[in-house]
Swiss-Prot record:
Keywords: Acetylcholine receptor inhibiting toxin, Disulfide bond, Ion channel impairing toxin, Neurotoxin, Postsynaptic neurotoxin, Secreted, Signal, Toxin. Residues 1-21 form the signal peptide. Expressed by the venom gland. InterPro entries: Snake_3FTx (IPR003571), Snake_toxin-like_sf (IPR045860), Snake_toxin_con_site (IPR018354), Toxin_cobra-type (IPR054131). This is Long neurotoxin 1. Pfam families: Toxin_cobra-type. It comes from Oxyuranus scutellatus scutellatus.
Amino acid sequence: MKTLLLTLVVVTIVCLDLGYTRRCFTTPSVRSERCPPGQEVCYTKTWTDGHGGSRGKRVDLGCAATCPTPKKKDIKIICCSTDNCNTFPKWP
């Protein structure tokens, strides 16, 4: 009887955990959204657009399975793994 009860508790915990999905801020709307299954990392990607920053700073927020790797040296990516941890950056 104890074994059956313990098994039911473990199965319940596993099922509840599998149903959870991360929430991250996403662009262009900058609102909190549920990430697709398997994407448990929130990221903030910032870069300067245009020649010499004439068009300003750009931001991309979203979800990923793993932290994205910058393809250029002037792209900065910050990753985190709690709900809504990728807030829009504050510019100096």
